[in-house]
Design a protein with these regions (language model features):
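Alpha-helical structural context detector biased toward long hydrophobic helices
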Residues: 25-409
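Histidine-centered nuclease catalytic patch
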Residues: 9-28
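Short cysteine-rich clusters marking metal-coordination/redox-active sites
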Residues: 4-7, 35
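Residues immediately within or flanking Cys/His clusters that coordinate Zn2+
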Residues: 1-3, 13, 32
Length: 409
């Protein structure tokens, strides 16, 4: 009999749980940590908080889930028209445009632009357009009520006969994504907790306290810190897109810390135990989502843990923390020299930070320098690798800046 690490009840029906959730394209799994009931409950409550958070990243890189396909991610053309990014990075339109014109012989012509394979939406928009322009149809001697089924039938026949033109947009595509926030803390803590017990059930920690925080989200905010160091927490031999998890004990500082970096762009540190006196622990795991291959990383964790709050806690800004942040920005600016990122996204991103004058001043200094590094917006004809790398660096910056603006619930 196995014992569930959440409800502590014994079970014999094996349940395959993703330590890194399937919604994140995770591949690390276990069959002896959770009972079926807890596995299902956590999936519908805690893992559910990740829905939609990283869909744009997954779709742009065409990453595979073991179960299901990532839904389209919302975006916009530069003209403002809505579109979606499909799995694999392909953009499709989301709306229907109908233009009406008349020729010298007083014949009405409709020019319709619509997303492929969205017949219900197309028919609905045709009906709406004709009803809204019924006076114009009646002036041309057309009964608008009969016009609706006739137009729908005519469009349907053209589609069946392939008498339509297919085209890709030449407009740059614009999207916004926000990484971070307290919604990530519960699923990340669940990942670290399961990862620890998957490898070391002998480690003595307050399991009930961690389980309560995962289940309720209470008193979890001060456990987490966004890692804005210029150097990565996990080092790899190959360039890739990695999920990484690590755990390390700091016996001198009496701390047990967990480290998570999702997609190589959302690095977090969490305090599993603030008064740890158990055995030494050092665990690490990495998975390259581009090569679909597990790879053991070299860990680059902080050498000390006693100052972890002073160094990374941006809930209260100090001159020292601002210096660390400036160092990270300067490092990222070197990366931006080589890639294009959408200018409007950066303009939207660099919002005023009102609760600390020193931070606001730094933003005003940073914005012109960033804009000098920005070239034209990326359109959908750029090579996917280049577009992906630019997007990757933009996400790092976005998550880093969001650390200033996070506030407790």
């Amino acid at each position: 009999m196995k014992k569930c690490v959440f409800c502590e009840k014994e079970f014999d029906e094996l349940s395959c749980e993703h330590i890194i959730p399937n919604v994140l394209c995770g591949h690390l799994k276990s069959k002896d940590l959770l009972c079926v009931n807890c596995n299902n409950t956590l999936g519908n409550t805690v893992d559910k908080l990740l829905n939609g958070k990283f869909d744009m990243i997954i779709n742009i890189f065409g990453l595979a889930r073991e179960n299901g396909i990532t839904p389209p991610a919302a975006a916009k053309l530069m003209s403002g028209r809505p579109c979606s990014i499909l799995h694999g990075g392909h953009p499709v339109g989301n709306d229907v445009q109908i233009d009406m014109s008349t020729d010298p012989e007083n014949h009405i012509s409709l020019h319709i632009t619509a997303p492929e394979n969205k017949i219900k939406l197309l028919n609905m928009e045709i009906s709406k357009f004709v009803a809204q322009n019924k006076d114009a149809f009646m002036r041309h001697g057309v009964d608008y009520k009969n016009a609706i089924p006739n137009i729908i039938k005519g469009v349907s026949e053209k589609i069946k006969k392939d008498e339509v033109q297919y085209r890709r947009t030449h407009e740059p595509i614009r999207f916004q994504i926000a990484l971070g926030g307290s919604d990530l803390y519960r699923p990340i803590l669940k990942m670290v907790y399961l990862f620890l017990l998957h490898h070391r059930r002998d480690v003595k920690i307050n399991r009930r306290e961690l389980v309560n925080k995962i289940e309720s989200g209470k008193n979890i905010y001060n456990m987490f810190f966004y890692c804005f160091d210029p150097q990565n927490l996990f080092l790899y031999k190959h360039v890739g897109l990695y999920h990484s998890i690590g755990i390390k004990s700091f016996r001198e500082d009496r701390k047990l810390l967990g480290f998570v970096d999702l997609f190589g762009m959302a690095p977090y540190i969490c305090i599993l135990d603030d008064n740890y006196d158990g055995e030494d622990v050092l665990l690490a795991y990495g998975y390259d989502l581009l090569r679909n291959k597990e790879e053991m990383p070299e860990v680059n964790f902080p050498p000390k843990a006693f100052d972890i709050k002073d160094k990374y806690d941006f809930k209260a800004t100090t001159r020292e923390r601002l210096a660390h942040f400036r160092e990270k920005c300067n490092y990222l600016l070197q990366l931006f020299e080589f890639y294009s990122i959408p200018e409007r996204i950066i303009q939207d991103l660099l919002v005023a930070v009102n609760y600390d004058p020193s931070v606001s001043q730094f933003f005003s200094e940073l914005k012109p320098k960033l804009q000098q590094c920005i070239v034209s917006a990326i359109d959908n004809f750029f090579p996917q690798k280049e577009r992906g790398c630019a997007f990757l660096h933009e996400c790092i910056l976005r998550g880093m800046l969001s650390a200033f603006q996070e506030k407790p619930n």
